[in-house]
C-alpha cells in the first residue's frame, strides 16, 4: 500500500463487507498507525503482541460511556495487527479508545484485561485533560479518549533551515517553564504562542535552534506527591504514552479538551 497522505482515499471504491453494532465495516489499513480518515470513513489500526481480540469504542464528545462497541472480526486480525475501516464516521462527531483481550500471565509479561479502556498510542489528539494540577474525581474512571485529526496544515513557502550541525547554537527549554512567569513579558505565558513570542529574544542571543523538553500529552498528576510541604508534579512530561498528540495545556487557544 502507498504511503499515507493527509486524507486516505485509497479503497474509496471498495464496499463494506460486514455490519457491526450498526456500522458498516471492512478490513482497514494494516500498514498504517492509529486512526486514518478517508473519504468514506476512518480506518482504525492498532498493533499488540499477544492480544487475541480487540474492540473499538466510540464516544460522543465529552461523554464517558461509549455509544458503540465494535469488536474486530477475527479476519481483521493479521499477525499482531488489528485493522478496521468504519464507514460513515465524521471525525468531529466522535472520540475513540480500544479494549484488548488476551492472556494474563505475569511471568511472561502479559497483563491483558479486556475491561481496561486504552488510548491509541498513535493518537494525534487526546481529550479528557483537567486544569493543570487538578486531581480527577475518584469515581471518574478512565477519562482519556483520542480524536481523529486531519493532517492538513499549510506549510506555504516555509522550508527547513538546514543549518550545518557544526553551526548549531541549541537552546533547550520547557514550553511551560520558559514563559510562565510574568517577567517573560509575553501575552500567552506557558504556551507555544509564548515561546513563539520569545524567538526574537533567542535570536538576539545568537540561538539558531530550540530543543524542547516533552511537548506531547502527559498526565502531570502521574507520581504527584507532597515533599516537605510542597506539591510536586510530573512537570517535565517524560512518559511513554501519546507521543504524537501535542500537549493541549501548552496551547493558547481552545483545543479539543477545552470545548
Where are these regions (language model features)?
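Structural beta-strand segments of beta-rich domains
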Residues: 40-44
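Carboxylate/His-rich catalytic cores and anion/metal-binding grooves
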Residues: 202-230
Amino acid at each position: 500500500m502507498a504511503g499515507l497522505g493527509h486524507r486516505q482515499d485509497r479503497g474509496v471504491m471498495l464496499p463494506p463487507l460486514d455490519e457491526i453494532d450498526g456500522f458498516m465495516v471492512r478490513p482497514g489499513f494494516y500498514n498504517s498507525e492509529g486512526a486514518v480518515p478517508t473519504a468514506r470513513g476512518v480506518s482504525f489500526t492498532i498493533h499488540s503482541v499477544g492480544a487475541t481480540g480487540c474492540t473499538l469504542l466510540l464516544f460522543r464528545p465529552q461523554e464517558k460511556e461509549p455509544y458503540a462497541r465494535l469488536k474486530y472480526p477475527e479476519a481483521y486480525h493479521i499477525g499482531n495487527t488489528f485493522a478496521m475501516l468504519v464507514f460513515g464516521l465524521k471525525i468531529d462527531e466522535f472520540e475513540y479508545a480500544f479494549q484488548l483481550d488476551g492472556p494474563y500471565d505475569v511471568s511472561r509479561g502479559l497483563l491483558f484485561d479486556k475491561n481496561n479502556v486504552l488510548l491509541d498510542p498513535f493518537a494525534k489528539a487526546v481529550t479528557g485533560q483537567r486544569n493543570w494540577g487538578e486531581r480527577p474525581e475518584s469515581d471518574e474512571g478512565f477519562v482519556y479518549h483520542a480524536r481523529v485529526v486531519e493532517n492538513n496544515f499549510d506549510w506555504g513557502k516555509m522550508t527547513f533551515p538546514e543549518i550545518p550541525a557544526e553551526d548549531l547554537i541549541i537552546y533547550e527549554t520547557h514550553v511551560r517553564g520558559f514563559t510562565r512567569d510574568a517577567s517573560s513579558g509575553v501575552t500567552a505565558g506557558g504556551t507555544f504562542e509564548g515561546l513563539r513570542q520569545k524567538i526574537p529574544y533567542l535570536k538576539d542571543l545568537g540561538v539558531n535552534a530550540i530543543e524542547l523538553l516533552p511537548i506531547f500529552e502527559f498526565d502531570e498528576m502521574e507520581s504527584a506527591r507532597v515533599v516537605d510541604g510542597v506539591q510536586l508534579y510530573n512537570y517535565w512530561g517524560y512518559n511513554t504514552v501519546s507521543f504524537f498528540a501535542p500537549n493541549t495545556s501548552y496551547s493558547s487557544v481552545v483545543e479539543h479538551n477545552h470545548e
